[in-house]
Amino acid sequence: MKILKFIFFLSFILLITSCSDDNADATPFILSNENIVGTYNISELNIETKVTSTTDVAGVLIPFTVATSISNGDIFQFAFVLNSDGTFSASGQFVIETEVTPATGDVVTNEEILNNTNSGTYTLNSENAKITFVSSIGDFLEGTYNILLFNETTLSLNQEIEQLSGAITNEINTSISFIRE
């Protein structure tokens, strides 16, 4: 019986040590200029906006939220191409539904079909996972975006910007996900 236990124990040890990870030799998909090149379609678009105003009350600046909005894209027929020479093009249409919630009054909902043509240059900073778009035509993609997810099939971007105009501040958070063709 002791020999049987010993053989079973040895068999178990051999079984465990002989198993290997099938993915051990697989190289990860690195964020690089070569790997990001390709044609993509939009899979998701979300834009959140907060509009605040500041007013001076007895020398103290008081912020006041004027309105918030949430915009969600849908029904995408949109091609986005990143070329190896650092240029990009984006064209097509999609439906965008926007819900604006003012500080006072009723919520306003709007749905429209947007047609976009956009082109320009891009610069990839793979070390910091950022991509910057400079548009020469259109303004669908403009500025620096954080790369949240990048793999063989998906590119997800996020941009948070703040626009000041006098006492009004617009905080805009844009998230876009693309699927590689």
Predicted regions and their residues:
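C-terminal motif of bacterial Sec signal peptides marking the signal peptidase cleavage site
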Residues: L14-S18
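Lipid interaction determinants
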Residues: S20-E181
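Positively charged n-region of N-terminal signal peptides that target proteins for export
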Residues: M1-F6, D21
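Hydrophobic helical h-region of N-terminal Sec-dependent signal peptides
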Residues: F6-I13
